[in-house]
Design a protein with these regions (language model features):
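Central antiparallel beta-sheet cores of small beta-barrel/beta-sandwich binding domains
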Residues: 27-100, 106-113, 143-144, 197
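N-terminal cap/lid segment of alpha/beta-hydrolase-fold proteins
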Residues: 128-171
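Short substrate-entry loop that stabilizes the transition state in hydrolases
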Residues: 171-173, 182-207, 212, 291, ...
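Alpha/beta-hydrolase active-site loop
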Residues: 228-249
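Alpha/beta-hydrolase fold nucleophile elbow
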Residues: 250-262
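Accessory cap/linker subdomain of secreted extracellular hydrolases
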Residues: 284-394
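Short beta-strand/loop motif that positions the catalytic acidic residue
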Residues: 396, 402-404, 408
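Catalytic active-site module of serine/aspartate enzymes centered on a nucleophile-bearing elbow/loop
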Residues: 439-442, 448-484
Length: 484
C-alpha cells in the first residue's frame, strides 16, 4: 500500500470511527429512567437526561425523583460499544450498564464502601414526573460579574474549580467563601433539587459582597480525592480559597469571611485557625458535638417522622455505636468493614423480631448486611466521626453569627445555644445567635422539618434568613449599598 492509499485509508478509518461514535451518541442521548433497588422492599426512581453535541460528546444531569432532587450535575458520561458509564462525583456514585436494545440499559450503581445497587434504565419520550420550580435561582442577565476560576491547594498541588461573583470590577468589596456540607458537593451545593450556594451567592452579590463558591475536592471539576478528604483537609482547601480572594484586586483583603452550612459549619472554625485573614464567620445549622453523636440524634429525631418504632430506633442506634467503635479502632476501612460484618451477627435476633414494616422503613435486609452501613466505611469517616468541633470553636475570636432552625432534624436546634455558649465562655464577646421558628436544616420555611420535604419546598432559603445574614454582614463590614 503506497503512502497516498495509506493516507486515505487512515482518513476513512477516522471518519468511520467518528460516524460510529456519533451514532452511539445519538442512541444514548435522551431521557432515561428506572428504579434504583436499595433492598427487597425499597427503591428510588432515578432519571438521566443525556445530551450529545455534534462532536459526539455527551453531557447529562440526574434526577432522584422520589427525593425531589433534580438537576444533579453529572461529571462524566461515555459509551463504548454497548457499555455505558455515568459518573456523579457529588454522590460519589458510578453507574455502569450495557445497552440491551435501543430503549434499554441493564446496569448497577456503585457507591463508596462497595455497595452495588441494581438500576435498569428505560428510554422515554417524556418523563412521568414534573421538575420542581426554583423561583430564587438567578436568571440572566445578571447585574453583577460572574467568573469561573481555579485556585491551587499548594500543599498537594491540586486545582479546585469554582465561581466568583462580584458587584463590580471597580472598587474593593468585602468577600465571603461558601463552605458546603457533607457529601461531595458541587460549587452550588446542589441538594434535593436546590442550588443553595447559587442562590446565596446571588443574594449576597446583589447586596454588595464578592462571593467565592467552589467544587469540593474530588467533586465536579475539582481535582483530588473526596473519599479520603477529612474535615481538616476541606478546611485547608477553604484556607487556600481565602488566599485566592486576597489576590483579587476588587476584594477588600481586610474583610474576608466564611459561611459554612451543616458540615461546612464544622469546617469553617478549622479554616479560621489555619488562615488568620478570616475576619468573620457565619455558622449555618452547624454542630457543637462530633458527627457520631449527631448521627444518633438524627435517629431519634427523624425515625419517628418515618413511622419507625422505638424498638427499631434503639436497635439501629446500638448497631451504629458498635460500628463507630469498630471504625475508631480498626487500622483501615477494609478491616473495619470485615469486623463490622462480624459485629452484626450479635444483633440478628433483635433484628428478626422487628416487624416487616420496620425492616422496610429502616432499610434492613435479612440477614443483616454490612452494606446497609457502607457509608461508615469511607476513608474520611475514621476522622470525621470523631472530629472535636469544640476544640476549634474555642479558638474563634472574630465576630460569629450562629443560626439554625427549630425544625432542623439533622442538626438539632439546641446546637445553636451549645455553640454560642462555647464561644462566649472562651472569651468571644462578638457572638450573635438565633434559632428561626419554622425553619429546617436548609433554613427553609418547613412543615415538619423532615428531609423528605426539602425538595417539595419552592424557596431554596427563607427570605428572612438571607436578609438577616446580609444585615449582619453589613454590620461587620460597615457597608455596602444594595445593587439590583
Amino acid at each position: 500500500m503506497n503512502r497516498k492509499t495509506k493516507f486515505f485509508a487512515l482518513i476513512f478509518g477516522l471518519i468511520l470511527a467518528q460516524s460510529l461514535f456519533n451514532l452511539l451518541s445519538a442512541q444514548i442521548s435522551g431521557k432515561w429512567h428506572g428504579k434504583l433497588i436499595i433492598n427487597e422492599k425499597t427503591n428510588l426512581t432515578v432519571a438521566f437526561e443525556i445530551k450529545g453535541n455534534k462532536a459526539g460528546n455527551l453531557s447529562s444531569v440526574m434526577h432522584s425523583v422520589d427525593q425531589k432532587a433534580f438537576n444533579i450535575p453529572v461529571d462524566t458520561v461515555y459509551a463504548e460499544g454497548n457499555d455505558v458509564t455515568i459518573i456523579i462525583n457529588s454522590l460519589a456514585a458510578k453507574y455502569t450498564g450495557q445497552l440491551i436494545n435501543k430503549d434499554g440499559i441493564d446496569g448497577h450503581m456503585a457507591f463508596p464502601g462497595g455497595a452495588q445497587m441494581k438500576l435498569d434504565l428505560q428510554k422515554v419520550d417524556r418523563f412521568p414526573f414534573s421538575i420542581a420550580e426554583r423561583p430564587q435561582e438567578p436568571k440572566e442577565p445578571l447585574p453583577y460579574f460572574s467568573d469561573d476560576i481555579e485556585f491551587l491547594n499548594k500543599k498537594l498541588g491540586i486545582k479546585l474549580k469554582g465561581t466568583i461573583t462580584t458587584p463590580s470590577k471597580e472598587g474593593q468589596y468585602p468577600a465571603v467563601v461558601l463552605i458546603s456540607g457533607s457529601g461531595a458537593s458541587d460549587r452550588n451545593q446542589t441538594i434535593f433539587g436546590h442550588k443553595t450556594f447559587l442562590v446565596m451567592s446571588d443574594f449576597l452579590t446583589r447586596a454588595g459582597f464578592a462571593v467565592l463558591r467552589y467544587d469540593d475536592r474530588g467533586a465536579a471539576e475539582s481535582e483530588g480525592s473526596f473519599l479520603s478528604a477529612t474535615i481538616l483537609d476541606h478546611a485547608e482547601d477553604a484556607a487556600y480559597a481565602v488566599d485566592f480572594l486576597k489576590s483579587r484586586e476588587f476584594v477588600d483583603t481586610l474583610s474576608i469571611g466564611l459561611i459554612g452550612h451543616s458540615l461546612g459549619a464544622d469546617i469553617a472554625p478549622v479554616t479560621a485557625t489555619i488562615n488568620p485573614s478570616v475576619s468573620y464567620v457565619i455558622l449555618m445549622a452547624g454542630a457543637a458535638k462530633p458527627l457520631q453523636e449527631i448521627i444518633l440524634e438524627q435517629c431519634d429525631a427523624i425515625y419517628p417522622t418515618m413511622g419507625i418504632s422505638d424498638s427499631a430506633t434503639t436497635l439501629n442506634k446500638d448497631i451504629l455505636q458498635s460500628l463507630f467503635e469498630v471504625v475508631r479502632v480498626a487500622p483501615d476501612t477494609k478491616v473495619a468493614r470485615e469486623q463490622g460484618a462480624l459485629i452484626l451477627k450479635q444483633f440478628e435476633e433483635r433484628a428478626s423480631a422487628l416487624t416487616q414494616e420496620d425492616k422496610n422503613l429502616i432499610g434492613y435486609s435479612t440477614p443483616l448486611d454490612i452494606k446497609t452501613w457502607s457509608g461508615l466505611f469511607i476513608p474520611y469517616m475514621k476522622h470525621d466521626l470523631f472530629h472535636d468541633n469544640e476544640r476549634y470553636l474555642k479558638q474563634l475570636k472574630c465576630p460569629v453569627l450562629v443560626i439554625g432552625g427549630n425544625k432542623d432534624l439533622q442538626v438539632l436546634p439546641h446546637h445553636v445555644k451549645l455553640i454560642e455558649d462555647i464561644l462566649v465562655s472562651n472569651g468571644n464577646k462578638r457572638v450573635t445567635a438565633k434559632i428561626y421558628p419554622g425553619k429546617n436544616h436548609l433554613l427553609q420555611d418547613a412543615i415538619t422539618g423532615s428531609p423528605s420535604e426539602y425538595g417539595d419546598i419552592e424557596n431554596t432559603i427563607a427570605p428572612d434568613v438571607i436578609n438577616d445574614i446580609i444585615h449582619w454582614l453589613r454590620t461587620q463590614t460597615g457597608r455596602i449599598p444594595r445593587i439590583n
